[in-house]
């Protein structure tokens, strides 16, 4: 099985979303993320993700920055480890 066979189509950011890496867990369903547009934001874990999708430090997520407060965002998607590795290989995530 070649390397290309193991690749899959991943959810990519829409125009109002950006890739981010979780840096720190703040508590109260909030995390500190480093976004690929160069901004560090406080991201909120929405209620529909709480206790269903567990987010940890160094996870790759998609965030949607708030229109009215650019230093805050909502998490919209979390990538599995192998999906995050694929994004890094393809150059979408810079460490």
Curated annotation (Swiss-Prot):
Entry keyword annotation includes Protein biosynthesis: yes
Transmembrane region(s): none
Keyword tags: Initiation factor, Protein biosynthesis
Domain S1-like span(s) in chain numbering: 6-80
Disulfide links within the chain: none
Coiled coil: none
GO molecular function, a single term: translation initiation factor activity
InterPro entries: NA-bd_OB-fold, RNA-binding_domain_S1_IF1, TIF_eIF-1A, TIF_eIF-1A_CS
Family (UniProt): Belongs to the eIF-1A family.
Annotated function: Seems to be required for maximal rate of protein biosynthesis. Enhances ribosome dissociation into subunits and stabilizes the binding of the initiator Met-tRNA(I) to 40 S ribosomal subunits.
Name under which the protein is recorded: Translation initiation factor 1A
Organism, as annotated: Haloarcula marismortui (strain ATCC 43049 / DSM 3752 / JCM 8966 / VKM B-1809)
Name of the gene: eif1a
